Amino acid sequence: MSMAISIRSSTRPVEVRRLGTVEYLDAWELQRGLVDARVAGGSDALLLLQHPSVYTAGKRTEPHERPADGTPVVDTDRGGKITWHGPGQLVGYPIVGLAEPLDVVNFVRRIEEALIAVCTGLGLDAGRVEGRSGVWLPGDGLRPERKIGAIGIRVSRGTTLHGFALNCDCDLSAFSAIVPCGIADAGVTSLTAELGRRVTVDEVTDAVAARVCDALDGRLAVSGVSVDTYASGVASTQ
């Protein structure tokens, strides 16, 4: 499938919904309802929100990656491993009917490209790391590679759910209780930590909405390394 065309099966605009702060389980229930509606002929949607502090585990999470102190974790049906969501992190859930033939790798790359474009627009040298999902800042002599955006999705009946998270001004210490995304030899960062000024969720929400829609519809070209080696790890299909 050419990157110059839409990955969506619908030509109707994506309905962007800014929901504020939503409990994780409530958002998951909303996603499932929107998938049912999309399969029945409804519109694609992009949910943009924040969660109260919560750990969620994808289907590939190993026992040693969970909090050692027994902190509760919500087990999900998405791809990927364990991560944290909470205040100061923008979470996006694209509920999108994919065009045939289904190309999950293409979908993941487009979401990554959208987040890379947002980070680049703020002056950061963001990109991909081969063999690892998400959006990263390169390592240097003082710091390792640092993940600023995470992706974990599910495809059910040809429709995506779950999605991505972009660290804006969240409390990064929340990641210290886990092995985030199963990666022990790299760091986690935020827009605020990298730019040296507070970057709120509200500041980037419009840009994220625009870039995600651009990427899904082919208006934002995808570049960078192939994600074939890890796409199966961040996506779960049914």
From Swiss-Prot:
CDD domains: LipB. Signal peptide: none annotated. NCBIfam families: lipB, PRK14345.1. Keywords: Acyltransferase, Cytoplasm, Transferase. Pathway: Protein modification; protein lipoylation via endogenous pathway; protein N(6)-(lipoyl)lysine from octanoyl-[acyl-carrier-protein]: step 1/2. It comes from Mycobacterium sp. (strain KMS). Pfam families: LplA-B_cat (PF21948). Belongs to the LipB family. GO terms for cellular component: cytoplasm. Catalyzes the transfer of endogenously produced octanoic acid from octanoyl-acyl-carrier-protein onto the lipoyl domains of lipoate-dependent enzymes. Lipoyl-ACP can also act as a substrate although octanoyl-ACP is likely to be the physiological substrate. The active site is at 181 (acyl-thioester intermediate). This is Octanoyltransferase. It is found in: Cytoplasm.
